Design a protein with these regions (language model features):
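Catalytic domains of riboflavin
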Residues: 1-100
Length: 100
């Protein structure tokens, strides 16, 4: 089995995987998890062992349906990463970032 296939199988099973990009892009790794397999424990691990910024991939249509505008109107980032405004909300929580 190839490393790619092993990672894909682990991802489908709900395991955390690290995906790295090219040295000519950001030269970094992203800790990824299939959203439907997320648990409080896995999200807490991601928050603790990364920058704490969690991203969710979605289509432009879905972002619009959720009323999530782009973070900036004129994207000057060299990679043109299309971040929306940040969301961190759960009723009853008052401490900021939470894995719940």
């Amino acid at each position: 089995m190839s490393n790619f296939q092993a990672a894909l199988d682990a991802y489908k099973n709900g395991d955390l995987i690290i995906v790295t990009d090219d040295a000519n892009r950001e030269n970094e790794g992203d800790l990824m998890l299939l959203a439907e397999k997320a648990t409080t424990e896995k999200v807490a691990f991601m928050v603790r062992h990364t920058t704490g910024i969690l991203c969710v991939a979605m289509t432009q249509e879905r972002a619009r349906a959720l009323n999530l505008p782009l973070m900036v109107e004129v994207n000057q980032d060299s990679k043109k990463t299309a971040f929306t405004v940040s969301v961190d909300y759960k009723p009853g929580l008052t401490t900021g970032v939470s894995a719940q």
